[in-house]
């Protein structure tokens, strides 16, 4: 069964996307471009370094993005190259990354709420922006149509 634009609109899938994206970026110390690139790569399942480079064309230039995402554990090697028969390594998003993306989808589908505990990095009332986001989270949780 193929989804249409009306089906997705009826789900209200993108209604709180910005808030959820900001939560994920702040909680997991990512920037917006990194998160969206990881979502793109997760959809590809397995990818090469060239696929990664192709995916970065629409994002801000960040020379260190590849190494940073690998060192932080967002990208894992699926198959190493062996210099004879396998000319390049193949990568996949890590378990940590796929869990984050699954959690984002669950929150977007209202199967799960954003955390509102005091331990949450995102829910601390330190700045004006934090208070605005906290109000938005409270409104999102109360929204019956999401």
Which ranges hold each PLM region?
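A short, conserved structural fragment
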Residues: 70-83
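Short amphipathic alpha-helical elements of helix-turn-helix/winged-helix folds
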Residues: 37-44, 100
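Short acidic DE-rich linear segments
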Residues: 131-146
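Short acidic, hydrophobic short linear motifs in intrinsically disordered regions
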Residues: 43-56
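Short, amphipathic alpha-helical interaction segments positioned at domain boundaries
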Residues: 95-129
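Short amphipathic alpha-helical interaction segments
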Residues: 56-72
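Short, cationic-aromatic polyanion-contact patches
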Residues: 27-31, 80-106
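Short alpha-helical segments that sit at the start of domains
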Residues: 4-36
């Amino acid at each position: 069964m193929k989804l249409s634009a009306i089906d997705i609109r009826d789900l209200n899938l993108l209604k709180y996307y910005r808030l959820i994206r900001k939560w994920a970026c702040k909680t997991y110390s990512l920037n917006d471009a990194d998160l969206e690139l990881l979502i793109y790569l997760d959809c590809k399942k397995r990818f090469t370094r060239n696929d990664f480079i192709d995916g970065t064309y629409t994002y801000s230039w960040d020379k260190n993005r590849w190494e940073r995402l690998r060192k932080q554990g967002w990208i894992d090697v699926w198959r190493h190259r062996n210099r004879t028969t396998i000319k390049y390594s193949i990568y996949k998003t890590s378990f940590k990354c796929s869990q984050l993306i699954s959690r984002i989808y669950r929150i977007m589908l209202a199967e799960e709420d954003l955390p509102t505990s005091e331990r949450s990095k995102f829910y601390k009332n330190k700045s004006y922006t934090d208070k605005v986001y906290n109000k938005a989270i409270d409104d999102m949780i109360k929204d019956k149509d999401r």
